[in-house]
């Protein structure tokens, strides 16, 4: 048996299903913060085996999805500059801006590169000394340490043609913003997995206490998620509001302190605009003033005029937990992974992409 098999074991899944059915006394709304959890929930069809009173609500845990259009347009402007190589991670290239996407811009001849690791920037910079290398850094606490490490190496190696546009965001701030929204009815949270490896699960304890809401930090496998749901239901029955660490094989209370200290060395918190949630206090990170020489937003003109989002797209409501992909009139029709209208259909962690991939709409 492979290590992961025990977390997909059919008998364990059915036993947990039975326990959940026995424990559930009232309808419960559980928001999974992480986009990876959304995909696991849909991939393993967990809603279909759980009581209908168990409702999963999809949260703002996809960094590409929550990136506002103004920042996409800024990326496109930077990538359009002469003598520039624009580098970033993941699905950002396919997110529509006001006019085009970064992928469209690359098709027109711009040097836009999707990286597997931020550290690839070092070789790109050394091989292109006559060009400006812009690293458009995105992601929650999971990817921030790699951006910090890249900056550290750029400084150590005295590389002067690399500039950072920082779009890193934090998990607790948008969760708090959602809980402060009286239109959102959430009884509990599935805490993120990979983020918690870095931050530790202790970071969520103030949220659980403030909003009297159970939080279960969960792994990605079906047994992980069902164990977390069972704990949440038991906490709800008992009237307790604790952070439960189901993902003990990877997450500790303190997290990766070395990575945290590296981030603190180069970054400071700042307000950040999230798609669908608006400007959130302390929701993002920016370079500290002493590293402003590496800040693309200070080195180059980043002012843009962005157009409003398509009225047909409800990504903003989905990210706030007020709607699901099926509520969108263009889902699976005008909006598909091949021709996405909204960011939730673009990203591999987006709720719409998960529904499209694993639900009957694509059968």
Which residues make up each language-model segment?
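Generic beta-sheet signal
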Residues: 89, 115, 136, 165-167, ...
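Short, conserved secondary-structure transition motifs
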Residues: 168-175, 255-258
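Flexible, glycine/charged-enriched surface loops at secondary-structure junctions
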Residues: 27-30, 162, 239-248, 274, ...
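A conserved active-site cap/scaffold subdomain adjacent to cofactor or substrate pockets
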Residues: 165, 183-249
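Internal helical hairpin/lid segments
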Residues: 227-317
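A short secondary-structure junction signal
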Residues: 145-149, 176-178, 200-203, 227-229
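Metallocofactor- and cofactor-centric catalytic cores in central/energy metabolism, strongly enriched
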Residues: 1-130, 144, 152-157, 165, ...
């Amino acid at each position: 048996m492979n290590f992961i098999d025990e977390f997909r074991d059919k008998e364990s899944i059915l036993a947990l299903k039975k326990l959940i059915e026995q424990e559930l006394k009232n309808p419960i709304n559980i928001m999974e913060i992480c986009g990876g959890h959304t995909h696991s929930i849909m991939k393993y069809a967990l809603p279909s085996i759980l009581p209908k009173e168990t409702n999963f609500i999809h949260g703002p845990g996809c960094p590409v999805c929550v990136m506002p259009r103004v920042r996409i347009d800024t990326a496109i402007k930077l990538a359009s500059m002469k003598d520039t190589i624009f580098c970033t991670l993941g699905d950002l290239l396919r997110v529509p801006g006001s006019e085009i996407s970064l992928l469209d811009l690359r098709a027109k001849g711009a040097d836009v590169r999707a990286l597997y690791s931020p550290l690839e920037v070092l070789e790109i910079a050394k091989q292109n000394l006559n060009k400006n290398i812009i690293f458009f850094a995105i992601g929650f606490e999971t990817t921030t340490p790699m951006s910090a490490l890249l900056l550290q190496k750029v400084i150590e190696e005295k590389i002067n043609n690399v500039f950072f546009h920082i779009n890193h965001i934090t998990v607790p701030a948008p969760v708090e913003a959602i809980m402060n929204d009286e239109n959102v009815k959430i009884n509990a949270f599935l805490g993120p997995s990979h983020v918690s490896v870095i931050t530790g699960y202790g970071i969520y304890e103030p949220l659980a206490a403030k909003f009297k809401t159970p939080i279960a930090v969960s792994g990605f496998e079906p047994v992980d998620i069902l164990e977390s749901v069972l704990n949440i239901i038991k906490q709800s029955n008992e009237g307790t509001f604790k952070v439960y660490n189901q993902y003990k094989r990877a997450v500790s209370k303190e997290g990766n302190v070395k990575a945290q200290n590296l981030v603190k060395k180069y970054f400071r918190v700042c307000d950040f605009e999230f798609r669908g949630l608006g400007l959130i206090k302390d929701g993002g990170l920016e370079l500290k003033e002493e590293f402003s020489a590496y800040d693309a937003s200070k080195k180059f003109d980043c002012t843009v005029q962005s157009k409003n989002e398509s009225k047909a797209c409800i990504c903003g409501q989905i990210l706030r937990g007020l709607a699901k992909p099926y509520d969108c009139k263009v889902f699976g029709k005008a909006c598909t992974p091949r021709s996405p209208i909204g960011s939730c259909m673009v990203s591999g962690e987006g709720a719409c992409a998960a529904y499209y991939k694993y639900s009957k709409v694509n059968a």
